[in-house]
Amino acid sequence: KHQTPNTKYQIPNTKYIYQDNQGLSEARNTGIKNSNGKYIAFIDSDDFINCQVLLDFLGKDDSDMPDVVFLNAVKYDKGRVSYFGEDYQPEKILNQSKVEVLKGLCRFRKFPGSAWNKIIKRELIIREKLFFEKGIYSEDIEWSMRLFNAATTFSYLDGCYYYYRQGRKDSITGTVSEKGIKSLLYILEKNAKMEFNRDISSYLYSFLSYEYLVLLFIMTSKNIACDSDIKRRAYHLRFMLLKSNKLIYKLIFPIITLFGVDITGRILKAIRGNI
């Protein structure tokens, strides 16, 4: 708060905006509304980036300006760098159709739904009103589903771009809370009502299915007592597993139907890392 106003005078083409703390979503939305560049990147306050990767991309011909550009990220902890373990495969993104790109992303065990590991064409964000929903946790998931449904062209930049600082406690699986569970449940219910394009529907439902299993997993946390309404709503969302393109998700559907969300959540916790 105290150093940023001084920093702005040292960095050219920088716009400094101050607003009272209204949460991450509103901070991003304010940035979007006040932006005027070709692309928008989202950087969390405790992380940092390799600016040269962006400069190399922006120096390219304007005729090749995709809607979304995927970027590599690494974990950073006290000067040490480690990899996430799942890197983008350029051949599954570059010069590929939207269907093939989403198909390639489905190979990830986790849904690549973070806002910070990609840059997005500003024109697309404004046209499709891709603002972040305020008042919820896991807003990146909700936003990414709308982004993937709206975008048509994709690309990939090689090189280490984003340094994700370790030791953070803001992940939904790292800090479980009642609001976190209700937020994820709300996001899943909202997307369950969306009409996705038929040719990409199964891939988007695979992303949702992963988050659905995360929901069942965190609902079994010892410090959280989920009421019957939350369990009922979670149970009714199991149909998403059948709409995904992954066999393992489809096989979990009858387990939930037979044993319910409580026992299934405990099973998922026992085999964590293998789904």
Task: Locate predicted features.
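Acidic donor-binding segment of Leloir-type glycosyltransferases
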Residues: 1-18
